[in-house]
Swiss-Prot record:
It is found in: Nucleus. Disulfide bonds: none annotated. The keyword Transport does not apply. One of its GO terms (cellular component) is nuclear speck. It comes from the Eukaryota. The gene is srsf1a. It comes from Danio rerio (Zebrafish). Residues 94-126, 202-257 are annotated as: Disordered. Belongs to the splicing factor SR family. Residues 94-117 have a biased composition (Gly residues). May play a role in preventing exon skipping, ensuring the accuracy of splicing and regulating alternative splicing. The keyword Nucleus applies. Keywords: mRNA processing, mRNA splicing, Nucleus, Repeat, RNA-binding. This is Serine/arginine-rich splicing factor 1A.
Length: 257
């Protein structure tokens, strides 16, 4: 297999992530399928080292999407290979150096060389006053599930969920918040585990009781999810309002999510 490159303009290290411990037969399109749902991709550089597992660099348009991808995909089981996903160690204050280790195949860990601290990457940190409260979420609904669902209304800059089945979502623009209440209230929500529920969406008041509660499932990163469960996740790509989206092709028979 030869590595493939999808080229785009250069960007910040905050937008670029390292993906290690890939299977030997991985293709650029396969890497794309794993990461496209987290945001617009600018560049995928897939490399195949002689005597070692392939690795790739994926560059997003938005650094918040890169954080989402690291949080959600580090440790992800891909055809028996546990992916190692982190920011390049020359960026984000990690110092300079190579990527030690890389892990073995067949579910071996991505050990060696360290990496970003576990649990560092939670919901995106950018905040907005254009906030809605969502209620009626199923127990397995995560902040990423909620963010994906609400992207149907526009650009989401923050999302989180709480133990009582409520969540908070913040939009970049006021009109997106208004559209979300009008179009997504009482719609069917589907979690990454396939649980469905009809949710209610309303504009957050100045003293919302749900905002700021302690989190539980929003921060947990499950490493035991099956690929079939991940395939069931319903993703809605962000509406294009600026730069063109990186448009994946989904004609392969082995579609991975």
């Amino acid at each position: 297999m030869s590595g493939g490159v999808i080229r785009g303009p250069a960007g910040s290290n905050d937008c670029r992530i390292y993906v290690g411990n890939l299977p030997p037969d991985i293709r650029t399109k396969d890497v794309e399928d794993v990461f496209y749902k987290y945001g617009a991709i600018r560049d995928i550089d897939l490399k195949n080292r002689r005597g070692g597992p392939p690795f790739a660099f994926v560059e997003f348009e938005d650094p918040r999407d890169a954080e989402d991808a690291v949080y959600a995909r580090d440790g992800y089981d891909y055809d028996g290979y546990r992916l190692r996903v982190e920011f390049p160690r020359s960026g984000r204050g990690m110092g300079r150096g190579g990527f030690g280790g890389g892990g073995g195949g067949g579910g071996g860990g991505g050990g060696g060389g360290g990496g970003a601290p576990r649990g560092r990457y939670g919901p995106p940190s950018r905040r907005s006053e254009y906030r809605v409260i969502v209620s009626g979420l199923p127990p397995s609904g995560s902040w990423q599930d909620l963010k994906d669902h609400m992207r149907e209304a526009g650009d989401v800059c923050y999302a989180d969920v709480f133990r009582d089945g409520t969540g908070v979502v913040e939009f970049v623009r006021k009109e997106d918040m208004t559209y979300a209440v009008r179009k997504l209230d009482n719609t069917k929500f589907r979690s990454h585990e396939g649980e469905t529920a009809y949710i209610r969406v309303k504009v957050d008041g100045p003293r919302s009781p749900s905002y700021g509660r302690s989190r539980s499932r929003s921060r947990s990163r499950s490493r035991s999810r099956s690929r079939s469960n991940n395939r069931s996740r319903s993703y809605s790509p962000r509406r294009s309002r600026g730069s063109p989206q990186y448009s994946p092709r989904h004609s392969r028979s082995r579609s991975r999510s």
